Amino acid sequence: MSTYTPKAGDVTRTWHVIDATDVVLGRLAVQAANLLRGKHKPTFAPHVDGGDFVVIINADKVAISGNKREGKFLYHHSGHPGGLKSRSVGEVLDKNPDRLVEKAVVGMLPKNKLGRAISSKLKVYAGPNHPHAAQQPVPFEIKQVAQ
């Protein structure tokens, strides 16, 4: 008997909604990345996009542990001499909290075509409202110790 190999068409996708209020950013990103990749399913295969859709709400209320709010910096470069720009995590969280959460989750996905396809199933919103109520998302609870 041959081993079952999942195909992309065989996958049934569900929608999960995660409330990021007071959840540590890294722990949130790990759980979201596992749901996106499909590692919670018995039919997981690393070469197949078999994951679910993930909607993260309240990204502006995510917890940043330690001194990272002021002490950790995010960098990008324009390509021109002297074009290095840096912002602290606190500045990014105040201005674009959805981008900060999305960058944390996408950083835990594969860096190839499959990873880019998987990252398109991630939806992040700064507030409590999202336009995906028609998909009937299932609430996903992240278990953590209180800070």
From Swiss-Prot:
This protein's record includes keyword rRNA-binding: no
Keywords: Ribonucleoprotein, Ribosomal protein
Protein name (Swiss-Prot/TrEMBL): Large ribosomal subunit protein uL13
GO cellular component: cytosolic large ribosomal subunit
Keyword Ribosomal protein listed: yes
A single GO molecular function term of this UniProt record: mRNA binding
InterPro entries hit by this protein: Ribosomal_uL13, Ribosomal_uL13_bac-type, Ribosomal_uL13_CS, Ribosomal_uL13_sf
A Pfam family it matches: Ribosomal_L13
SUPFAM superfamilies assigned to the protein according to its UniProt record, in alphabetical order: Ribosomal protein L13
Signal peptide boundaries: none
CDD domains recorded: Ribosomal_L13
UniProt similarity note: Belongs to the universal ribosomal protein uL13 family.
Biological process terms in GO annotation: negative regulation of translation; translation
Subunit structure: Part of the 50S ribosomal subunit.
Main function: This protein is one of the early assembly proteins of the 50S ribosomal subunit, although it is not seen to bind rRNA by itself. It is important during the early stages of 50S assembly.
